[in-house]
């Protein structure tokens, strides 16, 4: 038997078995995700809705105040939560726009947090707390920005500190938002099959 035939036969058998197994596996998957994912998202339901208030950002260039909005809702049958934040200048121009997806990884038993903002994207540690959440993002060598949010009684208060090893935390951003209503985003408006 030639070496080519020895290599081709197992590869062909693998390809056939993969083609046969894939439709069966696909039928077993729940398009709404798992119950564990939905349960993890339910613990964050306090985030849902439309929010508006202020964001104060401290930078080397000075202090900037924006009108900040957030809209939050679930998708994929409640198995993920999506967040869009926008910061508006006094003239109404969008100065900041971010989008995030919060999920639950059953293998690690931890939340996942993937964000897009200002031309960057990344996966960052995210932890639900009793009355909010916390997360952090790298901010250069030996530094992070650590965010802590408290959401209760219709108020979303989030503070971010720039933390460099061996130095005291510096205030970077503070958001103070009020819940202004419910939102059917992003689930509403799906394209119908006909």
Name every feature range the model reports, one short phrase each.
Residues 21-23:
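N-terminal signal peptide c-region/cleavage motif recognized by signal peptidases
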Residues 8-19:
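Bacterial N-terminal signal peptides
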Residues 1-5:
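Positively charged n-region of N-terminal signal peptides that target proteins for export
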């Amino acid at each position: 038997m030639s070496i080519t035939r020895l290599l081709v036969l197992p590869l062909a058998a693998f390809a056939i078995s993969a083609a046969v197994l894939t439709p069966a596996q696909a039928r077993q998957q729940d398009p709404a995700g798992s119950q564990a994912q939905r349960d993890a998202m339910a613990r964050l339901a306090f985030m849902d809705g439309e929010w508006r208030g202020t964001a104060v950002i401290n930078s080397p260039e000075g202090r900037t105040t924006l009108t900040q909005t957030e809209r939050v809702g679930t998708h994929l049958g409640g198995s993920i939560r999506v967040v869009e934040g926008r910061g508006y200048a006094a003239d109404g121009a969008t100065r900041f726009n971010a989008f995030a997806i919060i999920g639950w990884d059953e293998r690690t038993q931890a939340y996942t947090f993937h964000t897009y903002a200002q031309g960057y994207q990344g996966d960052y540690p995210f932890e639900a707390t009793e009355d909010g959440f916390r997360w952090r993002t790298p901010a250069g060598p030996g530094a992070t920005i650590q965010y802590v949010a408290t959401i209760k009684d219709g108020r979303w208060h989030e503070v971010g500190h720039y933390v460099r090893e061996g130095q005291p935390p510096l205030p970077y951003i503070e958001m103070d938002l009020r819940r202004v209503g419910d939102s059917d985003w992003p689930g509403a408006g799906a394209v119908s099959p006909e």
